Amino acid sequence: MNILIVGLGYAGNRFLRAFLHLDEQGYLDEPLKLAYVNRTKRKHTLQYYSSLSEALGAFDPQIVVVSVNDENHADILLQLRGYSGHVVCEKPLVNANNDLEATFDALSSISGFSFDLIERYSLISTSLKNFIEEKGLKLLRGNFYWGKDRINDRRPTCGATSEIIHALDLMQWLCPNEGHFKLQDVSGVISDYSVSGNDVLDTVAISSRLGNAVVTGYSSFVNIVRQRTLDLVFASSSGELVYAHMIFDTPNWDEDNLRVWKRLAGGNEIELMTISTDENRFGTALHTIYKLVQLCSDVLDQVYRQYPPSISSADLTTAVSLQRQLNEIERRA
């Protein structure tokens, strides 16, 4: 199984760690062979290629991981025209000034696509999604807060749209039967916080609707602490209000918590579900990449074992739909 990583920076090295971990665990019956494309050769024993075209011809990968900087996604994806393997792509798909339709068309020959929205792979996410479906809950209200500190970060970025995508996706993925997402109001802040320029979107607040449900949210790259929360209010089939509170990566990476409850007329609360993934993985091979390993194993299952995508998988159609939403947010911010 040949896997090509395009861009061996921060994100690319995370993917490398995830696939190497699965290989060391003997996840497949055959070894994984990894190679990379990068502007410069790194201190790795992996096969290095200076160009994507050279790598596609010489290495013949079954999986291509696109983990270059945001601004270079479109260029790499366009170079994959005619490629017939499986593509794994970091978010966002492209930037607002790229030709989205041309990018989508360039990927018409691929056998599969996996978008890196790893919060879907958390136990709290899949558990809540199944609970919503089993209980027939209807979303009334959603709110999110999604931020972290990227001030003076050396990694280039397209801005806060790269952060808000996680919350936008989770809301729609958790509640797929509510209807279409419609953006109503947007407020944004542009600053020189990033090495990418003097006018990069650092913060955005939105109000929107998902079907008839109101969804509000705030996302920022100038949050001084990592803060990733979703709050949801549902109506049950009997008319009771059901509340869900999700916290991701707090206090450490991959430590997620979910609480679901209902409140009675007298104010008393009844716990319906509590889930915590607070195992401390600091110092282990899975530190900061536990959910990413789940995504990578899903990809290997699809490509090697020909399994259908898991419930958590985000496909190309999802990536394009989210990109259209991000483009509108950036245009109106």
Question: For each predicted feature, which ranges?
Answer:
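Alpha-helix termini
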Residues: 20-30, 53-60, 176-181, 302-307
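N-terminal Rossmann-like dinucleotide-binding module
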Residues: 1-44, 58-59
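A contiguous active-site-proximal alpha/beta segment in oxidoreductase catalytic domains
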Residues: 94-154
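A structural signal for well-ordered alpha-helical segments within the folded catalytic domains
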Residues: 9, 13, 74, 122-126, ...
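Rossmann-like dinucleotide-binding domain that binds NAD(P)(H)
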Residues: 151-231, 317, 321
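C-terminal helix-rich "cap/oligomerization" subdomain common to oxidoreductases
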Residues: 27, 63-68, 289-333
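NAD(P)-dinucleotide binding in Rossmann-like oxidoreductases
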Residues: 214-294
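Beta-loop-alpha module in the N-terminal Rossmann-like domain of NAD(P)-dependent dehydrogenases
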Residues: 47-106
